[in-house]
UniProtKB/Swiss-Prot annotation:
This is Methionine synthase. It comes from Salmonella typhimurium (strain LT2 / SGSC1412 / ATCC 700720). Belongs to the vitamin-B12 dependent methionine synthase family. GO terms for molecular function: cobalamin binding; methionine synthase activity; zinc ion binding. Pathway: Amino-acid biosynthesis; L-methionine biosynthesis via de novo pathway; L-methionine from L-homocysteine (MetH route): step 1/1. Keywords: Amino-acid biosynthesis, Cobalamin, Cobalt, Metal-binding, Methionine biosynthesis, Methyltransferase, Repeat, S-adenosyl-L-methionine, Transferase, Zinc. Residues 650-744 form the B12-binding N-terminal domain. S-adenosyl-L-methionine binds at residues 946, 1134, 1189-1190. Residues 2-325 form the Hcy-binding domain. One of its GO terms (cellular component) is cytosol. Residues 897-1227 form the AdoMet activation domain. Residues 356-617 form the Pterin-binding domain. Residues 746-881 form the B12-binding domain.
C-alpha cells in the first residue's frame, strides 16, 4: 500500500472528508463562448464545441484550475478531475475520440498540480485527486430502440476498452484514486470496474476505487431499475474503498438511500447530492446553509465518511458542509454478517439463516422441451413467459441454459438475457448463467447488470484452467457453482464428493482470493430407482456430502439440479414431485441452500399421501433393498395431470363464491360484466335496498381504499372500481327511491374548478377517489363563481369545500373564495389543489384570509387521508393545529427568503440582453404569410403523442415507454395504455373528436421588449403588438433573456417574422365526457379528457413541425423521431402565454385577436384567459437559432410599471396577473 493510500485511510478513520462540488455549475458561471472552448488549437474544428466542458483542460486550463482551487479553499480534501465525459464513447459527440487519452491525462495532471500546491501549504491536511470515470452517454443494459428491446448501442467490451484508455491516462497523470461516478446503469459500472482492474494489473499499480451511483427518482432505483442494495451487491466485488450516491436528488430525497447504503456497506460511504431538486425553471434553490444543516444531520446519524456536492453546488456549499461536519465522528464500518449477496433488480442475500432458495429450471433448453422449441423457433416473447411463470411461481433465481447442438448458444444467450433486462418482473431476480462452454458463460456475464451465478466450473480440465476461469469470474463479479468433478471424473460417493470440494475450496480461497460465501458447491445429484444397485445410495450420498461440506468448508453454499434425482420417473409428474419433496426435505435439513427446480411444481412434504411419502423415503434414504420395486408398483396409481376443464373451473372459481365476495371481487378487479346480476341477488337477500350499498358494496370499496392506501392498487384501477360501484348504485336507485331511504356516507364535499378556469381532470380524479372511500361528492364542474360554490355548500350542508385550478389567475380566485367564506361566516375546511397551487401559496395568500381550516392537497392519493383527518372527532384538532403551525413556518420562511441571485434594475437587465450579431444573420423568410385554418386526424396526431404526462395524470409515476415495464406500476400502466389506444381507435373511427386549429405567420420586428407585428411586407401598418417580460435577476455568464430578443430589432433593418397558433384536441371533449358521466362511467370520462389533452399537445407538436418544414420552411429537411421532438431537438421555440417565458395570461388575447381564433376554430377565452375547451394549446413561433425556453421568474416594480404603461393597463391589474412572478410585496 502506497503512503498516499495509507494517508487517505488514516484520514478516513479520523474524520469526515470533504469532496468538491459541481464542476458544470461552476463552468457555467464563467459565461464561456464557443471561441473559449475552441481556443487556438481547435479554431477550425468541424463541429460546435461549446458544452464540451472536459475539453477546457486543454483550451482553458486556467478556468478549471481556478475551480479546483476554489473548492480546495472551501475545505475540500478530494477534488475530481474534469473528465466526466472524457471517454472515447462520450467524446464521439464532438468527433474527439482520439483526444480522450490526452484530455484525461491533462485533467489529472492539472488537478494533481493544484492538490500538491494546497498540500504544500498545509501538510497536515493532505489533498487528493480522484480520477473521474463518468457513465458515458450509452446504456449497456437498456435498449435505445423501443421497438427492439434486445438491441444495444454499446457493448461491454467497447466500454471496457474506453474505460481502460481513460484509466491509464488518469493514473499516468497523477490521480490518487479512480472514481466511477453517477452510475445509472450498473452494467456500465461493471465494465468500468473490469477495465480499471485490468489496467491496474497492466500498469502494476493498485489504487483505491470509489463508486457512486445515482438514484434517479422517488422510486428509489437507478435508471436501469436497481434498488440501492441490489446496486451495491452488483459491484461489491470491486472491493471499493468507498461506495456512495450522487446526483439526481437533493439531501431530503437522497437521505433514505444513503442511510440504507450506510447500513449494508462494508466499506466507507460517500454522498454528494444535488442542491435540492431543480425547480420549475431548472434551477437549484437549496442554499448553502440549509444544505449544510441537512448534511450535518446525516453526519450526526452516522451515515457518512465522505461528503460533497453535485449539480447546483458551489464552493459556498462545500465551505458550509466542511464547517458543518468539522469535529463530527466519521461513520464506523459495520460488522456485516457473511452472506452470498446476489442481485437482479432487487437483492437476494443468502446467509446462515436463509430459507431454501428455489432456482427456476424451465429456462433450460436441455431440461425443457417447450423452452428449447421456443428458442429454436425464435419465439422469444413466449420464452420470456416461461421465465416469468417461474418467477411468479416462486423462483428466486432463474437458471438459463442454451447448450443445444443446433443452436448458436452464444447468440441465444445474449439475446435472451438482453430481453430479460427489459422485463422488470423477471429481471428482479438474479440470473444463473448455465453452460458447459466458457465462451457462452463469458458472453452471458457481459449482459447482466446484477450479481449472478455461473453454473459451472470444475477441475475436470485441470487446475490451471480452473484458476483462470475463477479469476475472471471474480473480475466479472459473479458467484460460482463448482461441480464435484476433477481430472478423474465426477464424484459419485460421499467420500469423493467432499474430497473434490475440499480441494476446490482451498484453491479458490487461498490462490484466487474468491470469497467463500460466493462459492456454491454442486456435489452431483444422480438419478435413483434406476434398477441398478450401485445407484441406490446416490441420494443418500448427496445428503451426507451436504453435512460434510457445511462442517468443513465455512460459508460455502450447496446447490444441485433436483430434477435429476427423479429422472427414472419422467412422464409421471405426481411421483416426480413427491421424490423432489422428500429429497429436498432431507437435503435441506443437512445443509442444502438452493436447488434448480421447477418452481411451479413443488409439492409440500407434509401434504404427500402417507403411502407415497413412505415409499419415496425408502428410495431416497435407501432403507430397503426392494424400495425401487415398491415405488414402481405404486407409481401407476398416482399417474395423471390436471385437465383443461379443471383449470377453467379454477379460473372461474370466484363466480361460485357468495354474493358478498363476488361483489368485492368485481369492485377490486373493476369487472362490470356481472355487476347488475350480483347487485340484484344481493338486493333480494337484503331487507332494504340501501343495505346493499351500506353493506357489501361499501365493504368492497373499503377494500379498494385500503389497497390504494397501501400502494397495492393504482389510480386507474381505483377509477375502474368506482365505475363498477356507480353502476351498482345506479341499478339500486329506483328501488331506494321507492323506499324513500337514503344511505349514510363518511362526509359530503362540494368541489369545483374556480371561475375563469376550465381544467378539471385532477378534480374529477379526486372526486372518484373520495367516492371510493364513501364520501358524497357534489361536483359543480368548471368555471364556477364563488357565490355558486358557497350557496351550494349551504344548500347541501357540505362538510368540506374543495377548489381546483390550473392557470395562475385561478390562484387569485381561490383567495377570493376564501375571503367570501370568511365574510359569510363559514367554518368548514377548505381544500386547495391543482397544478399551479402550492403549499407556499396556500399558506401565504389563502389561509390568512379564512379562519377555518385551509389545507393544500398535493395529489389525489393524499386527499383521503386529509379529508378523514379533518372530519374525525379525534384527529381533527391535532391535524388542524399541526397544519397551521406548519403554514406559519412556511410564511416565516417565505418572508425571510432571499432570492438565490439578487435582482437587477430593468435598465441593467436590458443592457445584458442577448448580445446577438444581427449584421451576420439573415432571418429566414416565411413561405406562407397570413392566417390558415388547419386540421389533423387523430391517426396523424397519435404518432406525436408524448405519453409520459398521460400516465402522470393517472398518478402513475414513470417515463414512457419504461413505465410499461416498471416493476411496481408496469402491469397497470400496460392496461391503461391499451385502454387509451382503444379509446383513440374509437374516437378516430367514429369521428367523435375532431382536432382543429389555426396558424398565422407575419412580418415582425422587435421594438424594445415588445414585438411589432405587421400586416404585410411593407411593414408600415402594425396589426398588433406582442408584449414581453425580461428576466430581472443577476445573470453571471448568461443574458437576461426576453422573448423579444429572438426577433430582429426594427433599427437593424433586418426583415424578421413571427408566428402564432391555437389548437384544440376537439370541441366535442366536454360533451363526450358528459355522456360517459351519464353512464356512471368515471373511468372513460377521465380517459377521454386525458386523451383530448394529449391530442392537443400532439397537435401543437405536429403543427410546429409543419411550420418549420413547410409554412415558414426554415428547416425543410428536418427528420426527427417523436422522442427527438419531445426533447425539442429542433431549431425554434413555441412559447405559450401563461408559461415561464411569457407568464402573463392576457397575451392570449393578442393571439385570439391576431388569428381570429374563435371564428376559425370555435375555441374561446374565459374571463381569466383560460382556453376552452380545456384541451387546447396556443402560443408564438420563433425561428431564431439561439431561441430557447427560459423562465422570466421574479420581476421588480420598475418592470411592472413599465409593462403596465406599454400594455395600457393599471399597475394593480398587472400585479394581479403577474402575482406569482412579483419579486416584491405588492400589498
Amino acid at each position: 500500500m502506497s503512503s498516499k493510500v495509507e494517508q487517505l485511510r488514516a484520514q478516513l478513520n479520523e474524520r469526515i472528508l470533504v469532496l468538491d462540488g459541481g464542476m458544470g455549475t461552476m463552468i457555467q458561471s464563467y459565461r464561456l463562448h464557443e471561441e473559449d472552448f475552441r481556443g487556438e488549437r481547435f479554431a477550425d474544428w468541424p463541429c460546435d464545441l461549446k458544452g464540451n466542458n472536459d475539453l477546457l483542460v486543454l483550451s482553458k486550463p486556467e478556468v478549471i484550475a481556478a475551480i479546483h482551487n476554489a473548492y480546495f479553499e472551501a475545505g475540500a480534501d478530494i477534488i475530481e478531475t474534469n473528465t466526466f465525459n472524457s471517454t472515447t464513447i462520450a467524446m464521439a459527440d464532438y468527433r474527439m475520440e482520439s483526444l480522450s487519452a490526452e484530455i484525461n491525462y491533462a485533467a489529472a495532471k492539472l488537478a494533481r498540480a493544484c492538490a500538491d500546491e494546497w498540500t504544500a501549504r498545509t501538510p497536515e491536511k493532505p489533498r487528493f485527486v480522484a480520477g473521474v470515470l463518468g457513465p458515458t452517454n450509452r446504456t449497456a443494459s437498456i435498449s435505445p430502440d423501443v421497438n427492439d428491446p434486445a438491441f444495444r448501442n454499446i457493448t461491454f467490451d467497447q466500454l471496457v476498452a474506453a474505460y481502460r484508455e481513460s484509466t491509464k491516462a488518469l493514473v499516468e497523470g497523477g490521480a490518487d484514486l479512480i472514481l466511477i461516478e453517477t452510475v445509472f446503469d450498473t452494467l456500465n459500472a461493471k465494465a468500468a470496474v473490469f477495465a480499471v482492474k485490468e489496467e491496474f494489473e497492466a500498469l502494476g499499480v493498485d489504487l483505491p476505487i470509489m463508486i457512486s451511483g445515482t438514484i434517479t427518482d422517488a422510486s428509489g432505483r437507478t435508471l436501469s431499475g436497481q434498488t440501492t442494495e441490489a446496486f451495491y451487491n452488483s459491484l461489491r466485488h470491486a472491493e471499493a474503498l468507498t461506495f456512495g450516491l450522487n446526483c439526481a436528488l437533493g439531501p431530503d430525497e437522497l437521505r433514505q438511500y444513503v442511510q440504507e447504503l450506510s447500513r449494508i456497506a462494508e466499506c466507507y460511504v460517500t454522498a454528494h447530492p444535488n442542491a435540492g431538486l431543480p425547480n420549475a425553471f431548472g434551477e437549484y434553490d437549496l442554499d448553502a446553509d440549509t444544505m449544510a444543516k441537512q448534511i450535518r444531520e446525516w453526519a450526526e446519524a452516522g451515515f457518512l465518511n465522505i461528503v460533497g456536492g453535485c449539480c447546483g453546488t458551489t464552493p459556498e456549499h462545500i465551505a458550509a458542509m466542511s464547517r458543518a461536519v468539522a469535529g463530527l465522528l466519521p461513520r464506523q464500518l459495520p460488522d456485516i454478517p457473511v452472506a452470498c449477496r446476489l442481485s437482479g433488480l432487487e437483492p437476494l442475500n443468502i446467509g446462515d439463516d436463509s430459507l431454501f432458495v428455489n432456482v427456476g429450471e424451465r429456462t433450460n433448453v436441455t431440461g425443457s422441451a417447450k423452452f428449447k422449441r421456443l428458442i429454436k423457433e425464435e419465439k422469444y416473447s413466449e420464452a420470456l413467459d416461461v421465465a416469468r411463470q417461474q418467477v411468479e411461481s416462486g423462483a428466486q433465481i432463474i437458471d438459463i441454459n442454451m447448450d443445444e447442438g443446433m443452436l448458436d448458444a452464444e447468440a441465444a444467450m445474449v439475446r435472451f438475457l438482453s430481453l430479460i433486462a427489459g422485463e422488470p418482473d423477471i429481471a428482479r431476480v438474479p440470473i444463473m448463467i448455465d453452460s458447459s462452454k466458457w465462451e457462452v458463460i463469458e458472453k452471458g456475464l457481459k449482459c447482466i447488470q446484477g450479481k449472478g451465478i455461473v453454473n459451472s466450473i470444475s477441475m475436470k480440465e485441470g487446475v490451471e484452467a480452473f484458476i483462470h476461469h475463477a479469476k475472471l469470474l471474480r473480475r466479472y463479479g459473479a458467484a460460482v457453482v463448482v461441480m464435484a468433478f476433477d481430472e478423474q471424473g465426477q464424484a459419485d460417493t460421499r467420500a469423493r464428493k467432499i474430497e473434490i470440494c475440499r480441494r476446490a475450496y482451498k484453491i479458490l480461497t487461498e490462490e484466487v482470493g474468491f470469497p467463500p460465501e460466493d462459492i456454491i458447491f454442486d456435489p452431483n445429484i444422480f438419478a435413483v430407482a434406476t434398477g441398478i444397485e450401485e445407484h441406490n445410495n446416490y441420494a443418500q450420498d448427496f445428503i451426507g456430502a451436504c453435512e460434510d461440506i457445511k462442517r468443513e468448508l465455512p460459508h460455502a453454499l450447496i446447490s444441485g439440479g433436483v430434477s435429476n434425482v427423479s429422472f427414472s420417473f419422467r412422464g409421471n409428474d405426481p411421483v416426480r414431485e413427491a421424490i423432489h419433496a422428500v429429497f429436498l426435505y432431507y437435503a435441506i435439513r443437512n445443509g442444502m441452500d438452493m436447488g434448480i427446480v421447477n418452481a411451479g411444481q413443488l409439492a409440500i412434504y407434509d401434504d404427500l399421501p402417507a403411502e407415497l411419502r413412505d415409499a419415496v423415503e425408502d428410495v431416497i434414504l435407501n432403507r430397503r433393498d426392494d424400495g425401487t420395486e415398491r415405488l414402481l408398483d405404486l407409481a401407476e396409481k398416482y399417474r395423471g395431470s390436471k385437465t383443461d376443464e379443471a383449470a377453467n373451473a379454477q379460473q372461474a372459481e370466484w363466480r361460485s363464491w357468495d354474493v358478498k365476495k363476488r361483489l368485492e371481487y368485481s369492485l377490486v378487479k373493476g369487472i362490470t360484466e356481472f355487476i347488475e346480476q350480483d347487485t340484484e341477488e344481493a338486493r333480494q337477500q337484503a331487507a332494504r335496498p340501501i343495505e346493499v350499498i351500506e353493506g357489501p358494496l361499501m365493504d368492497g370499496m373499503n377494500v379498494v381504499g385500503d389497497l390504494f392506501g397501501e400502494g397495492k392498487m393504482f389510480l386507474p384501477q381505483v377509477v375502474k372500481s368506482a365505475r363498477v360501484m356507480k353502476q351498482a348504485v345506479a341499478y339500486l336507485e329506483p328501488f331506494i327511491e321507492a323506499s324513500k331511504e337514503k344511505g349514510s356516507s363518511n362526509g359530503k364535499m362540494v368541489i369545483a374548478t374556480v371561475k375563469g378556469d376550465v381544467h378539471d381532470i385532477g378534480k374529477n380524479i379526486v372526486g372518484v377517489v373520495l367516492q371510493c372511500n364513501n364520501y358524497e361528492i357534489v361536483d359543480l364542474g368548471v368555471m364556477v363563481p364563488a357565490e355558486k360554490i358557497l350557496r351550494t355548500a349551504r344548500e347541501v350542508n357540505a362538510d368540506l369545500i374543495g377548489l381546483s385550478g390550473l392557470i395562475t389567475p385561478s390562484l387569485d380566485e381561490m383567495v377570493n373564495v376564501a375571503k367570501e367564506m370568511e365574510r359569510q361566516g363559514f367554518t368548514i375546511p377548505l381544500l386547495i389543489g391543482g397544478a399551479t397551487t402550492s403549499k407556499a401559496h396556500t399558506a401565504v395568500k389563502i389561509e390568512q384570509n379564512y379562519s377555518g381550516p385551509t389545507v393544500y392537497v398535493q395529489n389525489a392519493s393524499r386527499t383521503v387521508g386529509v379529508v378523514a383527518a379533518l372530519l374525525s372527532d379525534t384527529q381533527r384538532d391535532d391535524f388542524v393545529a399541526r397544519t397551521r403551525k406548519e403554514y406559519e413556518t412556511v410564511r416565516i420562511q417565505h418572508a425571510r427568503k432571499k432570492p438565490r441571485t439578487p435582482p437587477v434594475t430593468l435598465e441593467a437587465a436590458r443592457d445584458n440582453d442577448l448580445a446577438f450579431d444581427w449584421e451576420r444573420y439573415t432571418p429566414p423568410v416565411a413561405h406562407r404569410l397570413g392566417v390558415q385554418e388547419v386540421e389533423a386526424s387523430i391517426e396523424t396526431l397519435r404518432n406525436y403523442i408524448d405519453w409520459t404526462p398521460f400516465f402522470m395524470t393517472w398518478s402513475l409515476a414513470g417515463k414512457y415507454p419504461r413505465i410499461l415495464e416498471d416493476e411496481v406500476v408496469g402491469v397497470e400502466a400496460q392496461r391503461l395504455f391499451k385502454d387509451a389506444n382503444d379509446m383513440l381507435d374509437k374516437l378516430s373511427a367514429e369521428k367523435l373528436l375532431n382536432p382543429r386549429g389555426v396558424v398565422g405567420l407575419f412580418p415582425a420586428n422587435r421594438v424594445g421588449d415588445d414585438i411589432e407585428i405587421y400586416r404585410d411586407e411593407t411593414r408600415t401598418h402594425v396589426l398588433t403588438v406582442s408584449h414581453h417580460l425580461r428576466q430581472q435577476t443577476e445573470k453571471v455568464g448568461f443574458a437576461n433573456y426576453c422573448l423579444a430578443d429572438f426577433v430582429a430589432p426594427k433599427l437593424s433593418g433586418k426583415a424578421d417574422y413571427i408566428g402564432a397558433f391555437a389548437v384544440t384536441g376537439g370541441l366535442e371533449e366536454d360533451a363526450l365526457a358528459d355522456a360517459f358521466e351519464a353512464q356512471h362511467d368515471d373511468y372513460n370520462k377521465i380517459m377521454v379528457k386525458a386523451i383530448a389533452d394529449r391530442l392537443a399537445e400532439a397537435f401543437a407538436e405536429y403543427l410546429h413541425e409543419r411550420v418549420r418544414k413547410v409554412y415558414w420552411g426554415y428547416a425543410p429537411n428536418e427528420s426527427l423521431s417523436n422522442d427527438e421532438l419531445i426533447r425539442e431537438n429542433y431549431q425554434g421555440i413555441r412559447p405559450a402565454p401563461g408559461y415561464p417565458a411569457c407568464p402573463e395570461h392576457t397575451e392570449k388575447g393578442t393571439i385570439w385577436q391576431l388569428l381570429d381564433v374563435e371564428k376559425h376554430t370555435g375555441m374561446k377565452l374565459t374571463e381569466s384567459f383560460a382556453m376552452w375547451p380545456g384541451a387546447s394549446v396556443s402560443g408564438w413561433y420563433f425561428s431564431h437559432p439561439e431561441s430557447k425556453y427560459f423562465a422570466v421568474a421574479q420581476i421588480q416594480r420598475d418592470q411592472v410599471t413599465d409593462y403596465a404603461f406599454r400594455k395600457g393597463m393599471s399597475v394593480e391589474d398587472v400585479e394581479r396577473w403577474l402575482a406569482p412572478n412579483l419579486g416584491y410585496d405588492a400589498d
